[in-house]
Amino acid sequence: MKNLNLYHFFDCKDRKITMYRLTEKGERIRDMFSDIAPRYDFLNRLLSFGVDRRWRRNAVKCIRWSEGGRVLDVATGTGDVALEIARQTPPSVAIVGVDFSEGMVALGRDKVAGSPYAGRITMEIAPCEAIPFPDDTFDSVTIAFGIRNVVDRSQGLSEMLRVLKPGGRAVILEFSTPRSRLFKRIYSFYFLRVLPVIGGLFSQFGAYKYLPDSVLEFPSQEEFKALMASVGFRDTAHRDQTFGIATIYTGEKGLK
């Protein structure tokens, strides 16, 4: 019987297969996203008033690509970022999406199959902490609204760095807390009081209670950039989106 909590990746340095097992918390998060997968896209549009699409477009504008190259989208969910990458890059660029939720990947594959980009996008089941590709494979690696759900963030970021080509770029889109006092109060009321209730009407209350809690626990912008630098990313930077509700982080892999 297949162990759904055990993953592997190829360690090019030691030329061996390395095994990675999800923690109990990681299992709970994965199962939660599989449960809400059928309503995930609808609720994203509803709860963000559609602005999440603009954030994703802005994030994809930050990637690097080359003719005949490859781009990886981690925590790809139902494939929104993978599809946006396909829209913004030429047909020679191949896109791979990985996610640890089988439910999300199943929906993503269906969405991709019905798009004009079916021949360019492949999707696989894997967590951020164990990306199943060799070193120096991708021009860019993206992750949108997923890094806060990675239990071992240092390991996840290290994996993203590992599979980047020298000179490649990681682009990370994540929720953040606005710095304006007035906007922070409005945002906090909506995020902590309204969002879980609306989410609960259409899906699981617990899942949309987890969302604001996980955002509040996420490091500050400067702290997260420091974490990126600590695993080896260079030239880390960030850009606020919509008054700081979300942030785009970028970091690069040094040339060898």
Curated annotation (Swiss-Prot):
EC number: 2.1.1.163, 2.1.1.201
Residue runs in coiled coils: none
Pfam families: Ubie_methyltran (PF01209)
Pathway(s) this gene product operates in, as recorded in its UniProt entry: Quinol/quinone metabolism; menaquinone biosynthesis; menaquinol from 1,4-dihydroxy-2-naphthoate: step 2/2; Cofactor biosynthesis; ubiquinone biosynthesis
Catalyzed reaction equations: a 2-demethylmenaquinol + S-adenosyl-L-methionine = a menaquinol + S-adenosyl-L-homocysteine + H(+); a 2-methoxy-6-(all-trans-polyprenyl)benzene-1,4-diol + S-adenosyl-L-methionine = a 5-methoxy-2-methyl-3-(all-trans-polyprenyl)benzene-1,4-diol + S-adenosyl-L-homocysteine + H(+)
Listed InterPro entries: SAM-dependent_MTases_sf, UbiE/COQ5_MeTrFase, UbiE/COQ5_MeTrFase_CS
Record key words, sorted: Menaquinone biosynthesis, Methyltransferase, S-adenosyl-L-methionine, Transferase, Ubiquinone biosynthesis
GO biological process, alphabetically ordered: menaquinone biosynthetic process; methylation; ubiquinone biosynthetic process
Residues annotated to bind S-adenosyl-L-methionine: 78, 99
GO molecular function: 2-methoxy-6-polyprenyl-1,4-benzoquinol methyltransferase activity; demethylmenaquinone methyltransferase activity
NCBIfam families in the cross-refs: MenG_MenH_UbiE, PRK00216.1-5
PANTHER family in the record: 2-METHOXY-6-POLYPRENYL-1,4-BENZOQUINOL METHYLASE, MITOCHONDRIAL, METHYLTRANSFERASE
Entry function: Methyltransferase required for the conversion of demethylmenaquinol (DMKH2) to menaquinol (MKH2) and the conversion of 2-polyprenyl-6-methoxy-1,4-benzoquinol (DDMQH2) to 2-polyprenyl-3-methyl-6-methoxy-1,4-benzoquinol (DMQH2).
HAMAP family: MenG_UbiE_methyltr
Similarity comment: family membership: Belongs to the class I-like SAM-binding methyltransferase superfamily. MenG/UbiE family.
Protein name from the UniProt record: Ubiquinone/menaquinone biosynthesis C-methyltransferase UbiE
Organism: Geobacter sulfurreducens (strain ATCC 51573 / DSM 12127 / PCA)
Source lineage: Bacteria, Pseudomonadati, Thermodesulfobacteriota, Desulfuromonadia, Geobacterales
